[in-house]
């Protein structure tokens, strides 16, 4: 029985299956953790959702910003952009079933036995783990409810960018969503900067990658995240693992076997080279 962590799939089904074949993944014995952004930009978003769903309880995934964007597009709240390559999914006969399954997936995973935490973008240094869990469950609760279109309509935006326990309502949900699915840089006080997408070292000096600020979580737990492909899996402190290595942009799909911390990679087999930045979400 092994635990495998895989970075952002982004519709790259062939690469995902090839990576699983490298380790002879057995869904009856092994567990697959996915950092989110299953869909968009790559060629096979529909088949990725079908495949991941078919793996049942052997999968522990989190939602990413592109997954949330898909939910908003399907709900008629956001526009379907050709570069996201979602048409097959949106018009599939089982689209309703897949969308309803997707919106009931977690936004944060915590395993107390493994001392492992996973979120698509990371955990703000302003939170301890109990706070992160509360905020995650609030987002998950509304996403799985009949009120989810109201949340999807309100989630777009960069403010508020600073945590306060007094935050409430849609503003609180938006902040939490930005932390879990969009965050890269913070100011020294922990406030989110949602604009900078430069690589570390090229960002303004006032900004720090979230993982370079003192963490209230990473001392006791490992943190795995995706989202930030330009990191190429490098430059994070000990006990923090960046797993998005840009497969859909011609990079590779990365897997970490948690048991022995061994990495496996699968080079991209797709031809999508239209790297044009993340959607604003």
UniProtKB/Swiss-Prot annotation:
Record flagged with keyword tRNA-binding: no
Keyword Hydrolase: yes
EC numbers: 3.6.1.41
Record field: catalytic activity: P(1),P(4)-bis(5'-adenosyl) tetraphosphate + H2O = 2 ADP + 2 H(+)
Domain of life according to the entry: Bacteria
Top enzyme class: hydrolase
Single Gene Ontology MF annotation: bis(5'-nucleosyl)-tetraphosphatase (symmetrical) activity
Keywords assigned by UniProt, alphabetized: Hydrolase
Alphabetical list of PANTHER family matching this protein: CYTOCHROME C5, PTHR40942
Biological function: Hydrolyzes diadenosine 5',5'''-P1,P4-tetraphosphate to yield ADP.
NCBIfam families assigned: apaH, PRK00166.1
Family: Belongs to the Ap4A hydrolase family.
Name this polypeptide is given: Bis(5'-nucleosyl)-tetraphosphatase, symmetrical
């Amino acid at each position: 029985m092994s635990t495998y962590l895989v970075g952002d799939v982004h519709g790259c089904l062939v690469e995902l299956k090839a990576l699983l074949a490298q380790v002879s993944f057995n869904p009856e014995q092994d567990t697959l953790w996915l950092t989110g952004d299953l869909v968009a930009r790559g060629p096979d978003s529909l088949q990725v959702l079908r495949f991941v769903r078919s793996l049942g309880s052997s999968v522990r995934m989190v939602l990413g910003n592109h997954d949330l964007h898909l939910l908003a597009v399907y709900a008629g709240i956001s526009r379907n952009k050709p570069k996201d390559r979602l048409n097959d999914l949106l018009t599939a006969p089982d689209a309703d079933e897949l969308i309803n399954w997707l919106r009931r997936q977690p936004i944060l995973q915590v395993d107390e036995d493994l001392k492992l935490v996973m979120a698509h973008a990371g955990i703000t240094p302003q939170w301890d783990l109990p706070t992160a869990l509360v905020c995650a469950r609030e987002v998950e609760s509304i996403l799985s409810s009949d009120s989810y279109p109201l949340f999807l309509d309100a989630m777009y935006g960069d403010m508020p960018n600073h945590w306060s326990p007094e935050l409430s309502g849609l503003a609180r949900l938006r902040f939490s969503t930005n932390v879990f699915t969009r965050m890269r840089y913070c100011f020294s006080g922990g406030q989110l900067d949602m604009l900078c997408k430069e690589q570390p070292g090229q960002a303004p000096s006032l900004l720090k990658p979230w993982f370079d600020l003192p963490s209230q979580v990473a001392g006791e737990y490992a943190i795995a995240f995706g989202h930030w492909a330009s990191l190429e899996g490098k430059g994070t402190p000990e006990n923090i693992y960046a797993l998005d290595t840009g497969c859909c942009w011609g990079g590779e799909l990365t897997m970490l076997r948690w048991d022995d911390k061994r990495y496996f990679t699968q080079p991209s087999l797709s031809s999508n080279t239209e790297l044009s930045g993340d959607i604003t979400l």
